[in-house]
């Protein structure tokens, strides 16, 4: 079983995982064109209806797509059917950790490949100056959504930090000892 299949399955069956992981997963991370198409359908449904999709809704939406090859359509329908087959439960913490590592790995891989194309002159949109930005964006992929302090929930840690006695290095000047 591939991690990509587990991620796609959890996106349609596990609401907590979907809410936490979907903002960080991009369709470019899926190498297989069928998995990429299935993810696009799942993502479109979730963004439009803010609810987990059903098997029927995904297949109908896929059927309404125009310009899709027959092989891609058949493969996508087969993959969607497999997503809804009963499976054993997956540990949530393990799943989040593995998904974060997978996203980081894919982001770095994609940025390195794009950097090689830029360096070789195959990219018309970007010049070589964009390579550091691509790589830094890829290295910044993280599921940690905490920014700064939460003044209500972190009050104990903040109180301890403010009242912690620090080891001080004594100065020869008494005035410097008072202000530090």
Which role fits each region the language model picked out?
Residues 9, 141-180:
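The Walker A/P-loop phosphate-binding site
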Residues 19-24, 54-58, 75, 94, ...:
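Short coil/turn segments at secondary-structure boundaries
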Residues 1-102:
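Noncatalytic partner-interaction/assembly domains of nucleic-acid and motor enzyme complexes
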Residues 13-19, 34-36, 87-92, 107-109, ...:
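Short amphipathic alpha-helical segments, especially helix-boundary/capping motifs
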Residues 85-151:
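Interdomain "pre-motor" coupling segment immediately N-terminal to P-loop NTPase/helicase cores
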């Amino acid at each position: 079983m591939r991690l990509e299949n587990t991620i796609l399955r959890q996106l349609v069956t596990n609401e907590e995982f979907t809410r936490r992981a979907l903002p960080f997963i991009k369709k470019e991370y899926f190498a297989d064109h069928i998995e990429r198409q299935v993810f696009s359908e799942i993502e479109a449904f979730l963004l439009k209806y803010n609810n987990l999709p059903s098997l029927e809704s995904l297949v109908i939406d896929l059927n309404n797509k125009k310009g899709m090859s027959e092989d891609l359509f058949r493969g996508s329908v087969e993959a969607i059917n497999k997503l809804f087959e009963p499976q054993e439960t997956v540990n949530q913490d393990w799943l989040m950790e593995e998904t974060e590592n997978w996203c980081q790995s894919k982001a770095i891989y994609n940025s390195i490949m794009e950097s090689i194309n830029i360096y070789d002159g195959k990219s018309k949109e970007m010049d070589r100056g964009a390579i550091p930005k691509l790589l830094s964006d890829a290295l910044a992929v993280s599921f940690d959504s905490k920014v700064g302090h939460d003044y209500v929930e972190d009050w104990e840690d903040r109180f301890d930090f403010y009242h912690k006695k620090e080891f001080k290095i004594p100065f020869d000047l008494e005035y410097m000892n008072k202000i530090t």
